[in-house]
Amino acid sequence: MNIHEYQGKELLRTNGVPVLEGVHCKTVDEALAAYDKLNSKVVAVKSQIHAGGRGKGNLYFPESGDLVMEGGVKIAFSREEVKTYSENILGNILVTIQTGESGKLVRNLYIESGCDIAHEYYLALLVDREKKSVMIMASTEGGMDIEEVAHNTPELIHRISIDPNSGLMGFQSRDLGMALGMSGKSLKSFMKMLAKMYNMFVSNDCTMVEINPLVKTDNDDIVALDSKVSFDENAEFRHKNWDDMRDLSEEEEVEIRAKESGLSYVKLDGNIGCLVNGAGLAMATMDVIKLYGGEPANFLDVGGGANEEQVKTAFSIILEDPNVKGILVNIFGGIMRCDIIARGVIAATEALSLDVPLVVRLAGTNVDEGKAILAESTLNIHPADDLADGAQKIVALIGGGV
């Protein structure tokens, strides 16, 4: 689950991480009032969407598609500039490297006080699933695309792994700060800030907290100038306040409906729909589709206890994507029974008048019953012996990749 920058800043502030004063706004008038309230010589006018790269993005009119303004984050030195930038941002489409060509409609602004900047850093806390730890990434190259830094100058990125049993140790914070060239007051400020940021990460069940840039001021203070925060939705039951932080307008309507039906769905840019049980198997299925020249249109995990109605809903959601030219069903029955999936597939195919190629691979619990149900139907369903066979068949049936 993602939240906006202004929400992330409030979370950081609540947990003792230094941030600048700012105001969340939804209208131009609110932005002007925020400027007056902040009483700062310079302010940042920041578009708020659930995507990175806002500063380097472009804003377009929704109707005509004409360019409105370059950059979704602007520095304003006057009330008039705040008005101009706010008018150009609110209600328009922001396209960034992370939004895709369709972009996102900007409904929220964050007006933030400015500060002097002596140096910009990159800092992020992430879940490292391979090492079963929290990974801290930091670089002296803040304010830039970290992917670009990693590609061109990987030696400038510093990584440390934190054992969740012992937590962040003081020497780790010190070593990281020194690796970034900090000393004296700035090093102490960094160590204090990082300890609070780590505690926030753990206590709020975050999967990512990214600050780009983290800045050192002329007074050697350390301040979070940006924030990107994501939560682990599996921990939602522990955090009742997450409902208040969720911005449904930033989420795909079809993904919301999928969640309400007990399905995990993420739309992608390909043309082969995927219906799979289990997140790991779903990702493996997408990988194998790409291996054989296809492009997955979605990630869809029906879970371990799906019923016929959920399978039907899953098909309906997949087929809402006009780019889908074929569907691959890949089920490994453990808790899930293959006969239930087979009946759901048939019910969905009949109810939705399926007119795209369908390949079904079944394995595991009640697999023989499931295969028999599919074989006895008069529907045009292509069985597959294994995942590789299924991926090759669906790619061939749709005439190749995208």
Where are these regions (language model features)?
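Short amphipathic alpha-helix used as the core "switch/output" element in two-component signaling
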Residues: 346-347
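ATP-dependent carboxylate/acyl-activation modules
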Residues: 1-211, 215-329, 339-341, 350, ...
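Short internal beta-strands
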Residues: 355-364
